[in-house]
């Protein structure tokens, strides 16, 4: 915790402003005031950051490196003020200087270096590692542009570049002296030197990987870890003036542009060859730079490379960083001169892998020809890994060629990254109990029966510091007033709140806090969308990436059905509802973008129909990102977690809503099952097919969406409404959704679960009428949410996978 008084803070802030901008504070604009505040807070952090690194180097603690293509950090100023313990001092000091802290905080651009749950999980994990005094650091890419900025124009998603670095980034420090060379293409020459086979990489394209370090501040514990993001630059920044002078302008800039494209944007479109190549380049780029940097740092502060696995743990977040396995092998073999056996032992013991999906589209594989041309030495190493591994399979599964072919790392013209990740790591974990069981018994059963000890579960978590303390300060204060502060450092102590739920004054205050948060969100919605919403209505919220398996379509069809009922019976006995959606569709994913348009057209129709718009309204918010989620989640009454059972690995928004006192309506998918186990069946609303039923349909067939539709007049009507011009004069506008549900037999069982979903929504309507009962349910969810803190998750990773057990003071 930083020790500073208000007057000292004011003095430091004034000095920093003058130093940065060369004028008095009263002459500055808000952007300049934000830059001065951010720079000052970073200055406060730097000395602790240096001390933390010094301590790690001196004590020889095991270092954990978390590799991820995504880090969805959001805004950092509020995090740092909270974790340093100076938010109140800062707020009061700025108030005396006629500066509104919240207004200044809102000027910070979200660091949107992620697409959704994968990147947000990585950010939560970094926060927990620092707060638990674990020597854990992030490794990723410093994208010049984030995923994209989403605008809804004429009901359609329009993608604009997310230029998050436009105003600079006050938190990062460029470490040019720590840059690494990453090699692409070229040829591998082999030779025997002293009776040993050697490999020399020639005629390659060199790329300079330059690290930018961002501090990760632990909660009031004087620990600051590091997020290192790599930026691609030409090896020489000298401009090719001779080519330019000769008029060869394209040659002068083409190399620079091709290199900088590597760290230009998250997830370039990969439906064409060049896009696939760029993605593969990105993955090797940050993995190679990161592994080289780790080994270099290890050798500087330790001695024997043979003991690397005792001092270093490398964790790969999904399959994107899987090339860490052959890259570490390359360094150990080619640069350190280790034998294959020793290098393989160290690599396996060092690397662990989290699987995040069972969707086939997300299990990466790369064409051999592309891979071999771009990464010739890495391909040679993977070939050798595969040959030795397949020999093991041949000895174990004699004559079972289909199984061996299925399990091989190289097959059918592709390099299979998930197979490589399993074979080359010592631990493979799923992210919820159901997900892990599906991996073990179905999707990766061949590997589980070969390597049962590798597989384990680590249910995801969220940092309660951001998603409760920061996002919902009034609820946090109620919790402190009723159960004390211990839950801040021991989140499972939230369970003590259950003992307060017989106190009607506590329930009343819970309701008041929710109402205040709803009013705050309603103001934001009016500001951005010019839609007035009733804060006495149920705020029914589904905010997440738009994807068929997440079933925003099911939610939308339910709203269309309710609209039909209200038009026919305006006196229908329902509590008014506001349906709130937010989420981005991948630029190349037409069905998801079409779903956004459907939601917006339905919203347009309902919100302009005076017969019903005092009962229901629909809002689709633009540009979903962390800072927007922080406003929506505390205001939600109902959390829609309605993915097709078996398809959502875990989910984390379900945990955020739960912690903020929303009731979950859910399928028995991912972590929803574990939420149900914690709160009990009376405090969550469950519907739909279970895992066994879904898996049975997948295995044996027998599902006909036409039959389901033809037996339900409500479904027939809403299905026809998709193509009869009701929501768009172009009757074919939503035909792809219609055909996805009926012609192509409804892959994600939207129609099958429709009736069960409507029955569950009726239950919501009934329960909400009993205010005390509803508030008690909210309180039970809050009380049982502590187990879903990422602190619990990280402790399990540290002790069960990484072998990092150093958890120090204040805990």
Where in the sequence are the language-model features?
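A conserved ligand/cofactor-binding region detector
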Residues: 1-811
